[in-house]
């Protein structure tokens, strides 16, 4: 486990529990964040309210309209920026419907928006006849001012088959084929594309795209599953390169080489009932639990082992569970006593990896 030593591990009236480098504060983040030291955390990863009044929940309302909601989130993120070390990164969740509000709040708080990771999934019920079926969510990649800290690309490549893609030359110093490929010189033992050479068999460059199967998928995909649909539209793959659909680790098993579009992106299952409620006495009733595996992926993109993550909207604790599993420290804030208790119970299971 990681060392429990942490600048935030000091007794405060709002501290609910601290253990194994993980701290949960019960309270409003607007009140708790100002008590934290400046430039004391390494990354921000959080799932704030969306501002649409999801399922009639009070905490997800728009605070009185667009401007009021953006001003509220800007205030929270301004404190997050103060607490975050210069040049460090974060991911902030948003629904497509109000992701422009969230991005505006990020920029107004002083962050730079660098990219958006889109998570596409196969389930979701339309909430009215004037809306499309919800099938995607956004994770906005932001950066604090200061020298840019690189993403951890090499540790998070997407697995491929054992076959070198046909478009890559196997002979160092040469270029496969002709035409436009002459603009892509090959490096010794890898491919060089202006960003340094790498071994093509080490996996694909992480994409800003994640996929989840439909709830109705079994051994074969259900109709309308985004994973199956992307593969279908990108063309057939050879039998020996078919992906292992239900693999627990995308970097193991068999993967596509250059065909089969879904294989080019990060696959993560939506959280099952057992995942959400493991070790929770009365079940996990939180309506927007995120997949632990997706949170691990995002954490590993922007932090090193042992570093400290801030989540000011902890919910039922998925970010903390993911941090625990990949040997990171975390400080989380949650306004609901019920969700704090669920998070405590989920974390009591300890690391699974």
Regions found by a protein language model. Give the residues of each.
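Core catalytic lobe of class I
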Residues: 2-353
């Amino acid at each position: 486990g990681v060392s429990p030593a942490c600048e935030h591990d000091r007794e405060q009236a709002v501290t609910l529990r601290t253990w194994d480098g993980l701290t949960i504060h019960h309270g409003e983040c607007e009140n708790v964040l100002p008590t934290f030291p400046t430039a004391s955390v390494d990354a921000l990863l959080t799932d704030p309210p969306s501002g649409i009044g999801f399922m009639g929940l009070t905490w997800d309302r728009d605070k009185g309209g667009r401007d009021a909601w953006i001003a509220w989130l800007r205030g929270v993120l301004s404190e997050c920026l103060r607490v975050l070390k210069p040049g460090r990164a974060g991911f902030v969740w948003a629904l497509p419907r109000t992701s422009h509000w969230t991005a505006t709040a990020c920029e107004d708080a002083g962050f730079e928006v660098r990219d958006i990771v889109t998570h596409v999934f196969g389930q979701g019920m339309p909430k009215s006849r004037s809306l499309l079926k919800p099938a995607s969510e956004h994770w906005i990649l932001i950066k604090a001012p200061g020298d840019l800290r690189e993403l951890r690309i090499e540790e998070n490549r997407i697995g491929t088959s054992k076959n070198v893609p046909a478009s890559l030359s196997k002979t160092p110093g040469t270029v496969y084929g002709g035409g436009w490929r002459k603009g892509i010189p090959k490096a010794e033992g890898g491919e060089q594309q202006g960003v340094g050479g790498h071994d093509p068999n080490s996996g694909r460059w992480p994409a800003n795209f994640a996929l989840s199967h439909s709830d109705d998928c079994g051994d074969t995909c259900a109709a309308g599953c985004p994973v199956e649909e992307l593969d279908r539209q990108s063309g057939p793959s050879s039998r020996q390169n078919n992906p292992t659909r239900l693999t627990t680790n995308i970097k193991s098993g068999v993967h596509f080489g250059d065909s089969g579009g879904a294989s080019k992106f990060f696959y993560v299952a939506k959280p099952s009932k057992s995942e959400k409620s493991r070790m929770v006495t009365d079940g996990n009733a939180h309506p927007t639990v995120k997949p632990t595996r997706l949170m691990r992926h995002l954490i590993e993109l922007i932090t090193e082992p042992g570093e400290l993550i801030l989540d000011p909207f902890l919910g039922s604790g998925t970010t903390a569970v993911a941090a625990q599993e990949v040997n990171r420290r975390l400080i989380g804030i949650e306004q609901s006593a019920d969700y704090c208790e669920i998070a405590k119970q989920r974390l009591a299971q300890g690391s699974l990896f």
